[in-house]
Amino acid sequence: MQHRIAERFRRGRLFLAGEAAHAYSPATGQGMNAAIQDAANLGWKLAFAAAQPGGSAILLASYDHERRPVARQVLAMTHLAFWGEASTGRLPALMRGTLAPLAAPLLPALMSRRHLVAAGIRLLSQLPVSYRGSPLSVEGTPQARGGPRAGDRLPDKIVRSAGRTIRLHELLARPGVHVLLERDADWPDDLAAGPMINVHRLTSAPAAA
């Protein structure tokens, strides 16, 4: 069993994604998730750069900055999981042969805790992935307290915009860059011009998902 990761995910006009960029052990089944996230991250940036050639250098460079650290984290997690499941070493053998049977009676109680199950699902689905260290992730001033920060995955909430009630992820499904404005936020009309720039004014605070 082997795992590997490319030294870089981009060189000039060449980009690596999916198993061309990284290969993991099958433990926890992360390969497809990572490949889809690579494609989603890179796809819109290529489309935007094609529509707006000027100033796209930082945008395209951000792909390697964002996805390669995530690939390293996933590699470490899958390696640890495979080590625990299959290694013939003394410690993993002790964990499987002695500690796991002792802990097995606790499993039903743990599985009944919805927050624990939800946290496990989020982890395996790679939903907590964050790009806070990306050159594209710039915090506002003053920095907002609580909630997602620049580079975090945006939660899916129910909002009102342009007279309709809609889920936030559905509102943002259109390709391009999206600007979310509060009801009374100032926004010059001329800044809304340009291809792949979408401006949404939220007329109510996000409700619980």
Regions found by a protein language model. Name each.
Residues M1-Q30, A34, G55-A57, V70, ...:
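FAD/FMN-dependent oxidoreductases across multiple families
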